[in-house]
């Protein structure tokens, strides 16, 4: 998919598309304390990567809460990645009262977005998407939501995550 819609208007996705069965490419993002983080930092764990345009919107807030609530019952790790500033992500976590949520910022280089094909070119934000990786970083599930303001398929993503 190289085009989605956002609020009904066409948006072009930039970056390298990855597919189920591929090994996930590395990326460099920042945590809430401005520390550099890469995929290798989560080696040996299954991962549910929830990608949101902005943590400060209602749909993104609900997506982050749902995946963290449901997937945290399993062994593994849940990462929420957006192009928000780390300060905004930290503030959101504090105001939401969520201490165990891992939010990562791709604002600096869009490394994650470029390597996973989810940069919304016209907006310089990340498209709503979900990637599930096994312990070897093989992509076992991928969804790029076709309308950026819609929810992902929670049931399908969580089933893929639980079945690893």
Swiss-Prot record:
The active site is at residue 60. The keyword Magnesium does not apply. It is an enzyme of class 1 (oxidoreductase). One of its GO terms (molecular function) is thioredoxin peroxidase activity. The keyword Disulfide bond applies. PROSITE patterns: THIOREDOXIN_2, TPX. Pfam families: Redoxin. InterPro entries: Redoxin, Thioredoxin-like_sf, Thioredoxin_domain, TPX, Tpx_CS, Tpx_Peroxidase_subfamily. Homodimer. Thiol-specific peroxidase that catalyzes the reduction of hydrogen peroxide and organic hydroperoxides to water and alcohols, respectively. Plays a role in cell protection against oxidative stress by detoxifying peroxides. The active site is a conserved redox-active cysteine residue, the peroxidatic cysteine (C(P)), which makes the nucleophilic attack on the peroxide substrate. The peroxide oxidizes the C(P)-SH to cysteine sulfenic acid (C(P)-SOH), which then reacts with another cysteine residue, the resolving cysteine (C(R)), to form a disulfide bridge. The disulfide is subsequently reduced by an appropriate electron donor to complete the catalytic cycle. In this atypical 2-Cys peroxiredoxin, C(R) is present in the same subunit to form an intramolecular disulfide. Belongs to the peroxiredoxin family. Tpx subfamily. This is Thiol peroxidase. It comes from Staphylococcus aureus (strain Mu50 / ATCC 700699). The gene is tpx.
């Amino acid at each position: 998919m190289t085009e989605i819609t956002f609020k009904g208007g066409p948006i072009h996705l930039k970056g390298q598309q990855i597919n189920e069965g591929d090994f996930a490419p590395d990326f460099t993002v920042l945590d809430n304390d401005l520390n550099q983080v890469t995929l290798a930092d989560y080696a040996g764990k299954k991962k549910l990567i929830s990608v949101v345009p902005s943590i400060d919107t209602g749909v993104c807030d609900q997506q982050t809460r749902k995946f963290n609530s449901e997937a945290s019952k399993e062994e593994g790790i849940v990462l929420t990645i957006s192009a928000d500033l780390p300060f905004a992500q930290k503030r959101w976590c504090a105001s939401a009262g969520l201490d165990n949520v891992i939010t990562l910022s791709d604002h600096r280089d869009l490394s994650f977005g470029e390597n996973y094909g989810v940069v919304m070119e016209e907006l310089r934000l990340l498209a709503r998407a979900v990637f599930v990786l096994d312990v070897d970083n093989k992509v076992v599930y991928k969804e790029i939501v076709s309308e950026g303001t819609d929810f992902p398929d929670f049931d399908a993503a969580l089933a893929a995550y639980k079945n690893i």
